[in-house]
Every structure is written in structure tokens, then in C-alpha cells.
Amino acid sequence: MELGSRDAFARMETLGIEEEFYIVDADGRPTSGIDDLVYGRDPPAEVPEGFDHELFKCTIEAQTELIEDPSNAVDALSTVRAALVDHAAADGYRIAAAGLHPAAKWRELEHAEKPRYQAQLDRIQYPQHRNTTAGLHVHVGVDDADKAVWIANRLRWHCPVLLALSANSPFWNGFDTGLASARAKIFENLPNTGIPSAFDDFDAFQRYERRMVERGSIADRGELWFDVRPHTGHGTVEVRAPDAQRDPGVTLAFVEYVHALVVDYAERYADGESPPTLRRELLDENKWRAIRHGHDASFITRDGEDTVSLGEAVADECDRLGIDGIRDVYDAESGSQRQRRLREEGGLDALCDDLMLSP
């Protein structure tokens, strides 16, 4: 039974970045490639721990090393991305990034044979069989377990903001869904997903985690797929809300934002601040607005008494936290808008070509 521990939470502000990508052929269409890229040969020297795969044979995950100093995030991310692109190219593959690949049709794609994923397919059935999603996960180290749970509770309001900024998955199974992030809607059809309820402290979270494993709801703690969670193995707060990104600058803007939020909330925790009561129903409404509208979303405020546009929220957050990256992301064309424009102007070929990472 794989469960984490309070002792894992020992260090503040370390970073880890996990990105899920699509393995594609020369035409940019998803294709099975994990037998070559994950199991077929040794990993590149730059990423000695190698790459992992996800549910489908056309998906692959790249993780940075533990980033001790947040100022090294740019180099760490560029190193692992370049290594993945080169590793794939050696076997004739390309790498593409989006929350959902617009050319992916799940009935035509192969599932991975790894026992963990086969067990999930058997347990969850249809929602997992069609789960061709790809996301971005950001870890920030926290040096106290109760603090980590307190911070995760507070980050719940920010998850829809991150999702709206990142939304770049309008196409699903060959058609336009009308959503900015169809990935988020597809993924939250799985159990133990979405924005979680608040937990009183680490003991409460660990009791829940243990109960879910002991009662057979999940195989291990890694199957709690919430938008934000204390990671009891790594000793981090993990934010899992964003769609995967082609542009590393966008990924790094989200990393900067999540890191700044964790540092800010850690200081508030130390000051003894009482967290506001956030109803999950209102958080779910905010997430729906992000899914549907992306950059055009507005959100119910924390007190439930007003709404704030994404642009206003971004401006407030940048001024409050002293960051700029998400302002640039908001000011630019959104990922979902870009995909729709490219498909209209150049068709599916142009869109698939645009999603591929540069060699």
C-alpha cells in the first residue's frame, strides 16, 4: 500500500515540472511510440531517469530534475524538452503539445500495456478508455505537512484562473467542442478529480488518503487526481489544473505563478491568517467558466458577492505577487483561439504542424 508521510514535507520552494506530450509521426498525427522511446533504448544522458508514459501509447511524460533554486527553472525545462525532442527524433518521431490533440481519436489509439493502466481501465471503464488528455503539473516544496494542506486549500480558488489561462484544447475526437478546455471536462469524468474539498489538517488528508486505498477505491495515493493536492511522497503542493503547453514560456509563466502563490500563502500561514470559507460548489462554477470561456471567463469572487474578469484577476495577482508572466499569457492570443484560427485558415494539417515542438 503506497502512502506518503508527514516527514516528506521538509523543504521550501523546491520546484518540479511534469509535462505530458503526444508522440506524433512526421505529419503530426498521434502514433504509438512508447515501446521505442520508453522501453526500447537507454534514456539520454541529459535525463538519466528517462521518460515515462501515460495511458495511451502515443503519450509520454517528461519531468525536470528536482530544481533547488527557482531561478534555474528555465534551464531545467529547456534541458528536458530538448532531450525529449532529440530522443524522439532518433526513432523518427516528433513531439506535440496541447491539452488534447486535435487529431486524436481514442478508439483508433492503443492503450499502454503497463499493469497499472490496465487495472485502471478495468476499474474505471469508459471514462478512462477515452482519456487522451495531456496536462501540466507543477510541484513546489513545502517544509511542513499541515502548512502544505493549508496552502492547497487556498490554491483551490486559483486553479480555475490557471485553467482559463492555459486552455488550449477546443477539439475532441475530431470536432470542435465549443469549449476552451475540453481536456478538463474529459478528465474530470474520472473519479477523484476536479477541485477537492478543503481538509482541516494533514492528519485529515492522510486519513482520507489511507481510507481510499484501504477500501479499494484507488490502488495508491497517485490515483487521487485532484486539480491541487499535497503530494505526500514528494513533500510538495502539486497543482495539476493547466492544459499542457507547446510554448515553454507559457509553462514557465505558470510555474512562476504557482511558486509565487505558495510562497505568499506560506507567509500568511506563518502569520496565523484564517482562511476564508470557499464553497466547493462556487469553485466548481468557476472551473466550468474556465472550461467554457478560457480567456473570456469571469469568476465568482472568494466571498461569493461579486465577479471578476480573468483580466482583472491577472492584473491583481501580478501586482500583488510581483510577477509578470501570466500577464503576458493573458495579453497574447489564447491557445484555444489560436487552434481554432489555424484550423480555419490552414486546416488540420496546419494545426497539427503548429503543435509540434521545435527540434
From Swiss-Prot:
SUPFAM superfamilies reported for this sequence: Glutamine synthetase/guanido kinase
Coiled coil start-end: none
Catalytic activity, EC: 6.3.2.2
Catalytic function, reaction form: L-cysteine + L-glutamate + ATP = gamma-L-glutamyl-L-cysteine + ADP + phosphate + H(+)
Keywords: ATP-binding, Ligase, Nucleotide-binding
GO MF annotation list: ATP binding; glutamate-cysteine ligase activity
Entry's family note: Belongs to the glutamate--cysteine ligase type 2 family. YbdK subfamily.
PANTHER family cross-referenced by the UniProt entry: GLUTAMATE--CYSTEINE LIGASE 2-RELATED (PTHR36510:SF1)
Listed name of the protein: Glutamate--cysteine ligase
Classification lineage: Archaea, Methanobacteriati, Methanobacteriota, Stenosarchaea group, Halobacteria
